[in-house]
Structures are given as C-alpha cells and as structure tokens.
C-alpha cells in the first residue's frame, strides 16, 4: 500500500543580486554575489 503521509520538502530560492537598496544591513568582509543568494529547504 502507498504511504499517504509522505511529503516533499518546500524549496525557496532567494536571489537578491542587482538590488538597488544600499548595503547598510551587513558588516564584515567584502561581499560577493554568493552573499546575495540563498536556498531554503523546509519540511512542512
């Protein structure tokens, strides 16, 4: 029998490259394009 409780993860991709907002919210080392991208995976 098929397991009806099986669920797939929710995947959200954030791509903030090219944003015109001034970079005031972060401190630390020099940012690269990798600092403006993120993948979020969650089990709902």
Curated annotation (Swiss-Prot):
Annotated stretches, region: Disordered: 1-44
Gene3D superfamilies: Phycoerythrin alpha chain
The UniProt record lists the keyword Hydrolase: no
Chief place of localization: plastid
Region listing for 15,16-dihydrobiliverdin chromophore, in residue ranges: 24-26
GO cellular component, one term: chloroplast thylakoid membrane
Key words, A-Z: Bile pigment, Chloroplast, Chromophore, Electron transport, Hydroxylation, Membrane, Photosynthesis, Plastid, Thylakoid, Transport
Modification after translation: Contains one covalently linked 15,16-dihydrobiliverdin chromophore.
Keyword check for Protein biosynthesis: no
GO biological process, one term: photosynthesis
Family, per entry: Belongs to the phycoerythrin family.
Function in brief: Light-harvesting photosynthetic tetrapyrrole chromophore-protein from the phycobiliprotein complex.
Protein name: Phycoerythrin alpha-1 chain
Native source species: Rhodomonas sp. (strain CS 24) (Chroomonas sp. (strain CS24))
Taxonomic lineage from the root: Eukaryota, Cryptophyceae, Pyrenomonadales, Pyrenomonadaceae, Rhodomonas
Name of the gene encoding the protein in the UniProt record: cpeA1
